[in-house]
């Protein structure tokens, strides 16, 4: 995932905000912050996969690493469910497209995190 992915997600959330979908800007900023945090975590997983020495150190810290990974998956699942919920309650087709784009990005990030984490396990 690159900075374009984060920018795309921010653009989508800003469009949501401008459409006044009942989401406060505080909620949307929180979603952007969580998404950026997940992006950084996903990037760190990718870097760890590339460094062989880290695999051994990750295995030695396995319990803590698995708890952290579990927490990150809970965060992204929450974001996915939040976007799905908003998608279900909106009737405007433009808003639905915006939510679909946000959902697609979140699902892509979740898949990338899963791919890297399975390589590390």
Swiss-Prot record:
Q: Where is this motif: Nuclear export signal?
A: 12-21, 85-94
**Which InterPro entries is this protein grouped with?**
Flu_NS2
Q: What is its main location?
A: virion
Query: Coiled-coil segments, which residues?
Result: none
Location(s), subcellular: Virion; Host nucleus
**What Gene Ontology terms for biological process does this UniProt record contain?**
exit of virus from host cell nucleus through nuclear pore
Give the record's subunit note: Interacts with protein M1. May interact with host nucleoporin RAB/HRB and exportin XPO1/CRM1.
Q: Which HAMAP family match?
A: INFV_NEP
Which family does this protein fall into? Belongs to the influenza viruses NEP family.
Q: What is this protein called?
A: Nuclear export protein
What species is this protein from?
A: Influenza A virus (strain A/Chicken/Pennsylvania/1370/1983 H5N2)
Question: Lineage of the native species?
Answer: Viruses, Riboviria, Orthornavirae, Negarnaviricota, Polyploviricotina
